Amino acid sequence: MEGAMTEPGKEMTHLDARGRLRMVDVSGKERTAREARAEATVEVSPETLTRISEGTIAKGNVYEAARIAGIMAAKRTWELIPLCHPLQVTGVEIEFSADPARNEIRILSRVKTLDRTGVEMEALVAAAHAGLTIYDMCKAVDRGIVIRDIRLLYKSGGKSGTFERA
């Protein structure tokens, strides 16, 4: 796998010269302000969306449970994703917006740090885990829930600069 490429001129940093996985050594990098934002979309039935907004799901407040789950997941990403570094997460925000016309809930996560590597994975894990928690909170009334479109929207800081999804 030597020279494995994702984009011209960019190598897979988690592979050594023989193609073996390794955790990238970031000890020589400076701590810099970094931020990442991600999203996930949860499709639910119209009845489920109404029950969530009215607060009548038996397990409790769906959005607050999902918010806490997303925050907790961001802080523990290094335990969930192999080769992720443990980071000093300095802030996590999780927001929800319901779209009754599409029977969807959009989850937006924002994660910040002052560290040696980025928080893209933390933002993605936060959004995904919030979506999984919505599923768990609502599965008794809606088995057809779909979690989709988990993706990075924005990242800043570090050597690779800023990325913003168009």
From Swiss-Prot:
The keyword Transferase does not apply. The lineage of its organism: Bacteria, Pseudomonadati, Thermodesulfobacteriota, Syntrophobacteria, Syntrophobacterales. Pathway: Cofactor biosynthesis; molybdopterin biosynthesis. It comes from the Bacteria. The gene is moaC. Homohexamer; trimer of dimers. This is Cyclic pyranopterin monophosphate synthase. InterPro entries: MoaC, MoaC_bact/euk, MoaC_sf, MoCo_biosynth_MoaA/MoaC, Mopterin_CF_biosynth-C_dom. Its EC number is 4.6.1.17. The keyword Secreted does not apply. Keywords: Lyase, Molybdenum cofactor biosynthesis. It comes from Syntrophobacter fumaroxidans (strain DSM 10017 / MPOB). It catalyses: (8S)-3',8-cyclo-7,8-dihydroguanosine 5'-triphosphate = cyclic pyranopterin phosphate + diphosphate. Substrate binds at residues 83-85, 121-122. The active site is at 136. Belongs to the MoaC family. It is an enzyme of class 4 (lyase). One of its GO terms (biological process) is Mo-molybdopterin cofactor biosynthetic process. One of its GO terms (molecular function) is cyclic pyranopterin monophosphate synthase activity. Catalyzes the conversion of (8S)-3',8-cyclo-7,8-dihydroguanosine 5'-triphosphate to cyclic pyranopterin monophosphate (cPMP). CDD domains: MoaC_PE (cd01420).
